[in-house]
Amino acid sequence: MSAIALGMIIFAYLCGSISSAILICRLAGLPDPRQHGSGNPGATNVLRIGGRSTAAIVLICDVLKGMIPVWLAYQLYVPPFYLGITAIAACLGHIYPIFFQFKGGKGVATAFGAIAAIGWDLTGLMMGTWLLTILLSGYSSLGAIVSALIAPFYVWWFKPEFTFPVAMLCCLVLLRHHDNIQRLWRGQENRLWNKLKKKKEMTEKEKKRTEKEQRKED
């Protein structure tokens, strides 16, 4: 392993360890995503507790954590195998962040960013697969699982030299979703739309309650 490859792997892990969900929630005055919602510090949970705009910012930051290190390693001609290790290091940083007591998210967005750095054609296919699965099923976790299963085949078709590293990365994502896979199998996984609907209903109830209290005071 060259010094450049080793340096990029360390850099990728440190980038991944910056938990954008926790930091952005703090800046926005929102609850800690590790202690609310699903307990997962990721964009989907931030969507539940903070809304679309905050979740979108978290999603972009998580994608960039994987994209930037892998893109830099790609530009520095790091061999495909170590490029894959760089991508895995970024995801491991997101999953086990050194800056946040090694308690992180599931690494889906970061893995997506790492794969996107290899080619924009792969980005479109991955995004399309993820969105289509969510729209058809309503399960955010299923979108991530299906995308992780299909991604190696996309890479094999367009850039076969990166198939093995991407397959390793996707295995890591699937391992992080083992609880979701069990809940899906048992029919216990909650649909994303149902969670958002419940949140909207709770917000409306709180709003009505506040209005009633104000009327009483008047």
Swiss-Prot record:
Query: Which family does the UniProt entry place this protein in?
Result: Belongs to the PlsY family.
List its EC numbers.
Answer: 2.3.1.275
The molecular function terms in GO held by this entry are: acyl-phosphate glycerol-3-phosphate acyltransferase activity
TM region positions: 4-24, 54-74, 80-100, 107-127, 130-150
Q: What is this protein called?
A: Glycerol-3-phosphate acyltransferase
Q: Which InterPro entries match?
A: G3P_acylTferase_PlsY
**Which pathway features in its UniProt record?**
Lipid metabolism; phospholipid metabolism
How does it sit in the bilayer? Multi-pass membrane protein
What reaction(s) does this enzyme catalyze? an acyl phosphate + sn-glycerol 3-phosphate = a 1-acyl-sn-glycero-3-phosphate + phosphate
Q: Which Pfam families match?
A: G3P_acyltransf
Classification of source organism: Bacteria, Pseudomonadati, Pseudomonadota, Gammaproteobacteria, Enterobacterales
Q: Which organism is it from?
A: Photorhabdus laumondii subsp. laumondii (strain DSM 15139 / CIP 105565 / TT01)
Q: How does it assemble?
A: Probably interacts with PlsX.
Please indicate which superkingdom the organism of origin belongs to: Bacteria
Q: Where in the cell is it found?
A: Cell inner membrane
- Subcellular location, principal: membrane
Is-annotated flag, keyword Lipid biosynthesis?
Answer: yes
Query: Gene behind this chain?
Result: plsY
